[in-house]
């Protein structure tokens, strides 16, 4: 710092005192000139310049980092597969240490299989019941037809009892039968003969 004017005033007084006083007084006066702040302007600009220079360096550094990342690209699939394998092995090891959970899984699978088998058995039983009901209905229909035929023809009940022994269904199950489609013949309606003398029937046949 520059000093425009400095004055050093020293006033040293050593008053004459008796011999038993050993004190001395010394006075020094300094006059300092006015302080100028012109030298501080350079510090303000240097702070601003340093801020912008640091920002530019940071931007350039990030630009180079991004260019390197784009050149290398994404991680390879081999690394991803190896990480997945490690994860699976870790999960397998963690699950292997818990036998109770595996027992639960096997028991659940066994329960599901037993339920599926039970449902299949129920479906088969229902199918057999339906087939039996169909056979019963066809037998009842044949009995009704025979009774109507006996009433119209006036035959004795003994012949009806003979026909009742035979339960002939009115349909053929093509799935279980081994015959082809050509072998199946459409059955014609039974011809009911009324109580007529033999001579009349022979005449009709001759005509």
From Swiss-Prot:
GO terms for molecular function: corticotropin hormone receptor binding; identical protein binding; signaling receptor regulator activity; type 1 melanocortin receptor binding; type 3 melanocortin receptor binding; type 4 melanocortin receptor binding; type 5 melanocortin receptor binding. Residues 1-21 are annotated as: Disordered. Residues 7-21 have a biased composition (Polar residues). The keyword Magnesium does not apply. It is a single-pass membrane protein. Pfam families: MRAP. Keywords: Cell membrane, Endoplasmic reticulum, Glycoprotein, Membrane, Phosphoprotein, Transmembrane, Transmembrane helix. GO terms for cellular component: endoplasmic reticulum membrane; plasma membrane. It is found in: Cell membrane; Endoplasmic reticulum membrane. The keyword tRNA-binding does not apply. Belongs to the MRAP family. Homodimer and heterodimer. Forms antiparallel homodimers and heterodimers with MRAP. Interacts with MC1R, MC2R, MC3R and MC5R. Interacts with MC4R. Modulator of melanocortin receptor 4 (MC4R), a receptor involved in energy homeostasis. Plays a central role in the control of energy homeostasis and body weight regulation by increasing ligand-sensitivity of MC4R and MC4R-mediated generation of cAMP. May also act as a negative regulator of MC2R: competes with MRAP for binding to MC2R and impairs the binding of corticotropin (ACTH) to MC2R. May also regulate activity of other melanocortin receptors (MC1R, MC3R and MC5R); however, additional evidence is required in vivo. This is Melanocortin-2 receptor accessory protein 2. It comes from Mus musculus. The gene is Mrap2.
């Amino acid at each position: 710092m520059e000093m425009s004017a400095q004055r050093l005033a020293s006033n040293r007084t050593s008053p004459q005192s008796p011999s038993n006083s050993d004190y001395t007084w010394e006075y020094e006066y300094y006059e300092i000139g006015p302080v100028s702040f012109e030298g501080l302007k350079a510090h303000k600009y240097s702070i601003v310049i340093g801020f912008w220079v640091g920002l530019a360096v940071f931007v350039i550094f990030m630009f180079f980092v991004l260019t390197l990342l784009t050149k290398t690209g994404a991680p390879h699939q081999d690394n991803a597969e190896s990480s997945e394998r490690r994860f699976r092995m870790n999960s397998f090891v963690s699950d292997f240490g818990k036998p109770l959970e595996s027992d639960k899984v096997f028991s659940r699978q066994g329960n599901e299989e037993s339920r599926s088998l039970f449902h299949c058995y129920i479906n088969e039983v229902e199918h057999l019941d339906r087939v039996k009901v169909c056979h019963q209905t066809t037998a009842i229909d044949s009995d009704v037809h025979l009774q109507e035929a006996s009433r119209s023809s006036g035959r004795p009940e003994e012949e009806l009892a003979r026909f009742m022994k035979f339960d002939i269904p009115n349909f053929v199950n093509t799935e279980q039968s081994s015959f082809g489609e050509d072998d199946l013949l459409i059955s014609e309606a039974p011809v009911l003969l009324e109580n007529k003398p033999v001579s009349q029937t022979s005449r009709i046949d001759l005509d």
